[in-house]
């Protein structure tokens, strides 16, 4: 069996290296991009989002991983001239298994530009073992600085498009209500927190978080607490919220 698996890996690597199609002539893949890979940056992708999404353009760029949330990975790049931080979502999906997308890792990503619910994301990434394909995720370095912007509720508005997918921190949030998702899906156990900061309402959405004993962290942990949170800015129902993907990103203060 290992003998045949090696043949399959080599065949797949060759097809990627030579840009051979994996579909027959009578089965056209509508999402297949036949053009050259565009070497760019996250800023370049965001600036050309509409056209790149339309053409399902394949891009290659460097970025630093900020947070992991199951199938979703968040990444950033800092403009060396302006210091501006640009962020993007990498859709890992169910099939991509790699240790290269850990927080603080600087990597080269190759994938297709797509859009989901109005937000740009990178799909169709690969990291095939033993393959030398340029399309593989490339680890450049580990332990890189992750830029986290401190924000207040006045900045957390959808017109501030530069915050989308950014890693932010908000301090001194007074929790006033909590709600746990219970709809029979994979998000069961996720908690939505409504809080007040600087006199304004803010919404915090957690992933399904697990404690050190592998128990799901329940909403009562947050009730009536004063907290600082670090998370990813996401749009939901026309408003921004902060998505927390690790309990270590929540700091609790004594009342």
Named regions from a protein language model:
Residues 4-255:
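OB-fold nucleic-acid-binding modules
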């Amino acid at each position: 069996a290992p003998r045949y698996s090696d043949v399959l890996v080599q065949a797949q690597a060759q097809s990627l290296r030579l840009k051979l199609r994996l579909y027959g002539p009578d089965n056209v893949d509508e999402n297949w991009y036949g053009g050259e890979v565009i070497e760019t940056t996250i800023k370049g992708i965001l600036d050309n989002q509409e056209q790149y999404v339309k053409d399902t353009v394949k891009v290659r760029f460097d970025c630093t991983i900020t947070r992991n949330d199951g199938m979703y990975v968040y990444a950033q790049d800092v403009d060396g001239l302006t210091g501006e931080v640009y962020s993007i979502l990498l859709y890992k999906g169910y099939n991509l298994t790699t240790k290269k997308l850990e927080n603080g890792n600087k990597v080269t990503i190759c994938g297709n530009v797509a859009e989901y619910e109005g937000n740009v994301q990178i799909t169709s990434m690969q990291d095939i073992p033993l393959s030398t394909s340029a399309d593989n995720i490339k680890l450049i370095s580990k332990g890189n600085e992750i830029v986290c912007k401190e924000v207040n509720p006045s900045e957390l508005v959808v017109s501030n498009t530069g915050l989308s997918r950014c890693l932010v921190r908000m301090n001194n949030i007074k929790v006033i209500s909590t709600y746990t998702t219970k709809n029979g899906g994979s998000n069961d156990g996720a908690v939505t927190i409504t809080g007040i900061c600087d006199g304004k309402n803010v919404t915090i959405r957690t992933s399904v978080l697990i404690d050190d004993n592998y128990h799901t962290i329940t909403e009562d942990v947050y009730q009536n607490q004063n907290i600082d949170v670090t998370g990813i800015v996401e749009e939901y129902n026309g408003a921004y919220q902060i998505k927390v993907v690790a309990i270590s990103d929540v700091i609790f203060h004594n009342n």
